[in-house]
Swiss-Prot record:
<dbReference type="GO" id="GO:0030791">
    <property type="term" value="F:arsenite methyltransferase activity"/>
</dbReference>
<dbReference type="InterPro" id="IPR025714">
    <property type="entry name" value="Methyltranfer_dom"/>
</dbReference>
<dbReference type="InterPro" id="IPR029063">
    <property type="entry name" value="SAM-dependent_MTases_sf"/>
</dbReference>
<keyword id="KW-0808">Transferase</keyword>
<dbReference type="GO" id="GO:0032259">
    <property type="term" value="P:methylation"/>
</dbReference>
<protein>
    <recommendedName>
        <fullName>Arsenite methyltransferase</fullName>
        <ecNumber>2.1.1.137</ecNumber>
    </recommendedName>
</protein>
<comment type="similarity">
    <text>Belongs to the methyltransferase superfamily. Arsenite methyltransferase family.</text>
</comment>
<dbReference type="Pfam" id="PF13847">
    <property type="entry name" value="Methyltransf_31"/>
</dbReference>
<keyword id="KW-0059">Arsenical resistance</keyword>
<dbReference type="GO" id="GO:0046685">
    <property type="term" value="P:response to arsenic-containing substance"/>
</dbReference>
<dbReference type="GO" id="GO:0008168">
    <property type="term" value="F:methyltransferase activity"/>
</dbReference>
<keyword id="KW-0949">S-adenosyl-L-methionine</keyword>
<keyword id="KW-0489">Methyltransferase</keyword>
<comment type="function">
    <text>Catalyzes the transfer of a methyl group from AdoMet to arsenite, producing methylated arsenicals. Involved in the conversion of As(III) to a number of methylated products. Reduces the arsenic toxicity in the cell and may contribute to the global arsenic cycling.</text>
</comment>
<dbReference type="InterPro" id="IPR026669">
    <property type="entry name" value="Arsenite_MeTrfase-like"/>
</dbReference>
Length: 249
């Protein structure tokens, strides 16, 4: 599959999740039997987090970037691949009325779901925009912090994603990412498997390549945690790990 075909596969899958429910792993069997709430608890979300905006928690993450993001009141935060808004709303609690969270997602259905959740739960400091994280609908140097949870692996051109992230961050800006990376290369048939592509595996890069692109875009970074046991828990032994990092301009 070429990049356009991969994007279409991912877009259709997440449209389906937004409208019908389910998870990114439906049909792929990689997430086990955990509910969205239980998966979030296993990733370190508190019970208060899980209960705060339950309709926004679709169980699509591989970490909890709001837990290690150094957010403060007044920050302007960008959530790359915001989905139904779960992490965006948790970030909004941290930045308060003086701050703002902008969520960007490629699927109109997810954006609408997030907007509906914002109204339902009374979040006025969150805005959701439809857009491609490879070409962000934001001005240069306009955000203080970027968060992203298991999304960058889905983008065919990760170099563009990192360049765009660098572009929109203010001087001194920070990015906190939880994402899937490969520990060894996948065979071609798995790289083109639609379920694994939408399930955050087939589009993942080798860890060294991922970090190299981050550096090439201009970022300094620090790896905060690596979880290779996620392979056994959720991905049927495939050579992947959940990587958590902080990057800065």
């Amino acid at each position: 599959m070429d990049a356009a075909e991969k994007k279409e596969v991912i877009k259709k899958k997440y449209q389906e999740i937004a409208t019908l429910g389910g998870s990114c792993c439906s049909g792929g069997g990689c997430c086990g039997d955990l509910s969205a709430a239980d998966l979030s608890r296993s990733l370190g979300y508190s019970e208060a987090d899980v209960q705060a905006v339950p309709d926004a928690n679709l169980g699509l993450g591989c970490g909890n970037p709001t837990a290690f993001a150094e957010l403060k009141p007044g920050d302007i935060v960008l959530d790359l691949g915001s989905g139904a808004g779960f992490d965006s709303f948790l970030a909004a609690q941290r930045v308060g009325s003086l701050g703002k969270v902008i969520g960007v997602d490629m699927t109109q259905e997810m954006v609408k779901k997030a907007q509906d959740n914002a109204r339902k739960y009374g979040y006025s400091n969150v805005e959701f925009r439809q857009g491609d994280i490879e070409a962000l609908p934001l001005d240069d140097r306009s955000v203080d912090v970027i968060i992203s949870n298991c999304v960058i692996n889905l983008a065919p051109d990760k170099e563009k994603v990192f360049r765009e992230a660098f572009r929109v961050l203010k001087p001194g800006g920070r990015m906190y990412v939880s994402d899937m990376v490969l520990l060894e290369d996948l065979p071609e048939d798995l790289k083109n498997d639609c379920d694994l592509l939408a399930g955050c595996v087939a589009g993942a890069l080798l860890k060294e390549e991922y970090l190299g692109l981050l550096k090439k875009a201009g970022f300094s970074f620090k790896i905060l945690a690596e979880d290779s046991d996620v392979s056994k828990r959720q991905y049927e032994g495939l050579p992947v790990e959940s990587l958590k990092l902080k990057a800065w301009v």
